[in-house]
C-alpha cells in the first residue's frame, strides 16, 4: 500500500528485522509503525528490540499491536496518530495484511471503501472482508 492522501509516502510490508532499519532510514523513511504483537515474535524482533533499533537508525517508532480479530477504536486512533507523523512511513506486521487493514480503517470516511479495498488489492492484500467495518466507520464519521 502506498497511499493515504496528501501525496506522502505510506507503505506496509511484512516482518522486518532490526538490521533492516538503517536501510529504511537511508531510503528516506522517517516513521516505523510496528503492528506485530510481541507474543508472535522472538526476542530479537519484539517491541523493545525494534524500538531500540529504530531509534538508533533515527526513525520515529510507534508500537500498535494488532491481534487478528481484535480491532478496537483505540487501535484505529493510534494508527491514525502514527500515520499523521511527518515524513515517509512504513508499517509492518507478519505479512503486511493487518497493517493494510489498519491503514484502510484510518481512511474510512475520507476515501470510498472501493478505493481503499482496490489500493490494498493493488499492493497484494485482499482486505475486501473489511468492507462492512470500513463502511460502518465511514457512516459514523469514524
Predicted region positions:
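A short, structure-level motif marking secondary-structure boundaries and short turns
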Residues: 4-6, 34-37, 101-102
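Residue-level preference for short coil/turn positions at secondary-structure junctions
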Residues: 6, 28, 85-86
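Cysteine-dependent PTP/DSP-like catalytic domain, specifically the C-terminal lobe
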Residues: 109-142
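Cysteine-based protein phosphatase catalytic domain of the PTP/DSP
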Residues: 13-82
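Mobile, glycine- and charge-enriched loop segments
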Residues: 1-13, 20, 59, 138
Amino acid at each position: 500500500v502506498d497511499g493515504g492522501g496528501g501525496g506522502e509516502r505510506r507503505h506496509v510490508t511484512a516482518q522486518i528485522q532490526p538490521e533492516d532499519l538503517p536501510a529504511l532510514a537511508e531510503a528516506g523513511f522517517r516513521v516505523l509503525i510496528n503492528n506485530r504483537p510481541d507474543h508472535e515474535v522472538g526476542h530479537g524482533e519484539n517491541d523493545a528490540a525494534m524500538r531500540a533499533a529504530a531509534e538508533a537508525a533515527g526513525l520515529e517508532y510507534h508500537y500498535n499491536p494488532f491481534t487478528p480479530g481484535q480491532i478496537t477504536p483505540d487501535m484505529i486512533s493510534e494508527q491514525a496518530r502514527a500515520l499523521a507523523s511527518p515524513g515517509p512511513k512504513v508499517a509492518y506486521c507478519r505479512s503486511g495484511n493487518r497493517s493494510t487493514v489498519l491503514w484502510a480503517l484510518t481512511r474510512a470516511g475520507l476515501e470510498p471503501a472501493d478505493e481503499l479495498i482496490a489500493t490494498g488489492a493493488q499492493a497484494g492484500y485482499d482486505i475486501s472482508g473489511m468492507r462492512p467495518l470500513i463502511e460502518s466507520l465511514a457512516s459514523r464519521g469514524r
